[in-house]
Swiss-Prot record:
Pfam families: NHase_beta_C, NHase_beta_N
Biotech use, per record: Industrial production of acrylamide is now being developed using some of these enzymes.
Keywords noted in UniProt: Lyase
Enzyme class: lyase
Keyword flag Lyase: yes
Complex and partners: Heterodimer of an alpha and a beta chain.
Enzyme Commission number, as recorded: 4.2.1.84
Species of the source: Rhodococcus sp
Protein family (similarity comment): Belongs to the nitrile hydratase subunit beta family.
Protein name: Nitrile hydratase subunit beta
Record's catalysed reaction(s): an aliphatic primary amide = an aliphatic nitrile + H2O
Top-level taxon of origin: Bacteria
Function: NHase catalyzes the hydration of various nitrile compounds to the corresponding amides.
Length: 235
């Protein structure tokens, strides 16, 4: 889907200028948000692609002016409502209570060893998204392919700046969870994943592209159509 979250190639944003010593967390509540992700993921509120789509569902103005972990909280709320696991009226009541009573103690919970073990296993290295498939890869290294120009209404990993652009396959990684399916609640639907290389002139035009610059982009099989195969290879 289109949205303010897809800023690649957008004009008028200015340079990316992160602080030299940016802290991991800017406030204590961000630490809580970070830990909530593992708990809610483990509890089945969302998969990683569904989580991203929950962020994409944010009000655009709020998205642009809110800090990073506020995006996480918004996705938690979205999926809590979607799955029926969160009572938004109760959430509002508790929020108002703590706003009125900022020194009130938070509810206490004992440690959940299963969740701790899960977080210790997943947080440092992530959860693998590799999935087997009986489908054969449609493309080979060296193939010249065109990215889809479709604009799906739901979640996708096709960035706006590569839609309809022509690049070359430089790597094939195997089959992985397909975000356009998993992110929209339709299951893993494993698809082959490739890395494409684009000339800067293809992406930005002759007038603005830096000379001899290329950009790589990971793309799933359904995003692509063949333009030309390498000489001597079967199309």
């Amino acid at each position: 889907m289109n949205g303010v979250f897809d800023l690649g190639g957008t004009d008028g944003i200015g340079p990316v200028d992160p602080p030299a010593e940016e802290p991991v967390f800017r406030a204590d509540w961000e630490k809580a948000a970070f830990t909530m992700f593992s708990a809610l993921f483990r509890a089945g509120w969302f998969g990683i692609d569904e989580f991203r789509h929950g962020v994409e569902k944010m009000d655009p103005a709020l998205y642009l002016k809110s800090p990073y972990y506020k995006h996480w909280i918004a996705s938690f709320e979205y999926h809590g409502k979607r799955t029926g696991k969160l009572d938004l009226a109760e959430l509002d009541r508790r929020t108002q209570y703590y706003l009125a009573n900022p020194d009130a103690p938070l509810p206490e919970h004992g440690p959940n060893q299963e969740l701790i073990d899960f977080a210790n296993a997943v947080v440092p290295s992530g959860a693998p998204a590799i999935r087997p498939t009986d489908k054969e890869p449609r493309f080979k290294i060296g193939d010249v392919v065109r990215m889809s120009s479709d604009v799906p209404f739901g979640h996708t990993r096709i960035a706006g700046y590569v839609r309809g652009k022509v690049g070359r396959v430089i790597s094939h990684h195997g089959s992985f969870v397909y975000p356009d399916s998993a992110g929209n609640g339709r299951g893993d639907d494993p698809q082959h994943l490739y890395t494409l290389q684009f000339d800067a002139t293809e992406l930005w035009g002759e007038q603005y592209a830096e000379p001899n610059v290329t950009t790589t982009f990971d793309a799933w099989d359904p995003y692509l159509t063949l333009v030309t195969a390498p000489e001597g290879a079967a199309a």
